[in-house]
Amino acid sequence: MTGPDIDDFENALNAFWHGRPPASLEDVMALYGVLAVAESGGELYGTDSKLEPFVDDGRLVTIDIDLTGETPNVSDPKVDTLRVEDVSKLRYAHKSSGRGAKYSLTQIGSKNGNDAEGVASTILGRVRSWTTQDSVRSVTGEDGHPDGWIVEELAAVFEKGSDTLEALEEAIKALLPPDESLPTVITVRLRLDAGRLSHGEESGPRWFWPAELDVLEEAMKRYATANAADKNVESGDGISEGESVGLVTDRVERVVGTPDNPIGVFSVKHPDAQPGLRQDQSWRNYPVGADTAMLFSKGQDLVETCVLRRGGVETYALPYFAGELTPLKAQSLYGAIQSLDRESDYDDSGGSPLARVTYELRESDDETLQELAKTELRFYTITLPIGDDKNVIAEEPAAPVYWVSELADALAQTVHGPTLNPERGGFAPYDNWSLLELATEDFEESRKFGFYRIVGHQFTDSAFAYRGDDEDDDFRRVVDHRLIAGVPLDASMLFDEYLRRYHDESEGGDLPPHQIVAQQLVHLETLSRAGLLNGLDVPIEPPTMTTETETETDFDTTSLPAIREHRLESFLDRPLFEAPARRAAALAGVLVGQVSWHQESERNVGRPLDAQTKGDQLTKNSLENALTSALEKAKVYALDSEYRSDRDMLFPETVDRLLETTEDMPSAWPIEKRELQFCYVLGHAHGRRSMPVAFDLHEKEDEDDQDTEEPAESTTN
């Protein structure tokens, strides 16, 4: 078996697509159904392609039943390797994975295999279940099929608890090796008198496969469409159908009110959530044509491929192309979605469908596909809580990849710049921290990793406050949708989220890891560089940026004070700290961090100064007290410290710049509370690392000197 070719997509579009570009979620879901039709070789109901994983590697168990006598005669089942020539005879019709029996008499097990016990109980049980479905049994009634008697006979054979069914179970266990687990298909072959069939032109007994019997085709179609008009309808006559303009087709047709919706955004199951909704009249609220309802159902597996579940929410990123839908676009879209089944080098979680589809098309060898990805690729993104309650948290109907690309580029520039370069006053890169491990030597690799982080939730989650899995309305996902749509974020909101996360990380009394603050600075700087930050009078990013990490120091690394001073000057060299109040808040944080490190590391003080000065609880008055104490201790500790300067002051570079910045105490600084707190924690994170990083750079200089020393010349001849 091979995948669909471009002719399959052309035929599917001609048969089932309305002709205009996708303009709604329902359009996109119907489009995925059309792609699935092409996958099935043009079949709206049959799905031969789903048997591809079973061909050659799987087995076909056939149950022969002779219905030419007075009572059914069931032979022992036979087993053989499933071959490609068998597939068309089985008339398999797929129902989305994990949703019970499939639509056809032919049933399948797991692609990973079933043992003998599993085949006898689970797969054979699905055959039995199929014969009991009301929609299947309806072919035996007044509005049934002339050959409905065949289904009646099958129901009798597979009746639960019957001797025949139990005998079949035992026969299958005896037939199959008990320790062998293989992908398995079960079907039923019937021996019938052809003359009894309503549409038969033959006579006499012969064997019929499922694909040869019209009644099984009709039963399969009724099963597939059974719930489209009556699912959970408890009012009126229990059916919701009528005539109206179809939501997708834009033409007057028979519409149904309870179609299977792959995402579940419309349901009559919870009428309280939709005041005024009459279940039997839901077709007026959500008029979906009968064929469109089947397209929704058929495309379910493709839709499900495009979801990222994390925490208590699920985010669908459904790719499509703007403009006229051509066979080439349909084929390319199908191929990109299928690529989501493969492992990714950039996303361990297997998520981020938006990123993976984008790069599948961008990195295609076909220049036409590259151009399509650049100009016409769109995503319908929608985030909902996981569970029955399908209130939409955030939605973006036509998200381009432009702003994600801009953000990814800005993120790569940020991590390759001073912010993550200790020699230039920044923090160090760290493994296993989403925004601190991107500084690879290859800029393009960093950008690609960044793209995955942004659409995979890590960009926002690394900086924002925690939300529990039980929180349905996750504001972080709202923010993700805004960024994808290119909507700038307000700085005051960001500062509040950053400080709430800081608080989350400090529960238990411990200081948050400095990496938290470093990620928040990377986050803020990236937004600023991408033009997605509002509410500040200056940009965040440092004024001079390169895409290459500086590898050689251009300052004196033989002196610890010189290293500290250079790093402090570089840290402050950003527009954010041009405003005196912000600069002073950051410098106050630096000094408190430096003094606290000294207390903890050099004097074994059990409760250093910053343990009493929580950044997220900081007020101007409490900062004034902490700063006064830090200045006093910097003088006192200098009296007996081996790191004192010739001015009898610890960390004079910080004190000097603070006094140069302002002569006022914090209570007089013109700065908002959250802005004050964030600038302080930035400075504090730098100050806490001031001496450790200086030691590292100083030791690195010593090692470099040793490496460059030339060995003495040998005096031996």
Swiss-Prot record:
Subcellular locations according to the entry: Cytoplasm
Region (Disordered): 263-283, 698-717
Compositionally biased region (Acidic residues): 701-717
Gene behind the chain: cas8b
Name of this protein: CRISPR-associated protein Cas8b
Record's function text: CRISPR (clustered regularly interspaced short palindromic repeat) is an adaptive immune system that provides protection against mobile genetic elements (viruses, transposable elements and conjugative plasmids). CRISPR clusters contain sequences complementary to antecedent mobile elements and target invading nucleic acids. CRISPR clusters are transcribed and processed into CRISPR RNA (crRNA). Plasmid targeted by CRISPR locus P1 transform wild-type cells very poorly. This subunit might be involved in stabilizing crRNA.
Source organism phylogeny: Archaea, Methanobacteriati, Methanobacteriota, Stenosarchaea group, Halobacteria
Keywords, ordered alphabetically: Antiviral defense, Cytoplasm, Plasmid
Note: There are 3 CRISPR RNA loci in this organism and a single cas gene locus. A CRISPR-Cas type I-B system.
Matches recorded under Pfam families: Cas_TM1802 (PF09484)
Keyword Cytoplasm appears in the UniProt entry: yes
Loss of function: phenotype: Loss of the 8 Cas genes in this locus (cas1, cas2, cas3, cas4, cas5, cas6, cas7 and cas8b) leads to loss of CRISPR interference against plasmid targeted by this CRISPR locus, i.e. plasmid is not destroyed by CRISPR. Disruption of this single gene also leads to loss of CRISPR interference.
Gene Ontology CC: one annotated term: cytoplasm
Regions that span the bilayer: none
Entry-linked InterPro entries: CRISPR-assoc_prot_Cas8b (IPR013389), CRISPR-assoc_prot_Cas8b/Csh1_C (IPR013420)
Gene Ontology biological-process entries: defense response to virus
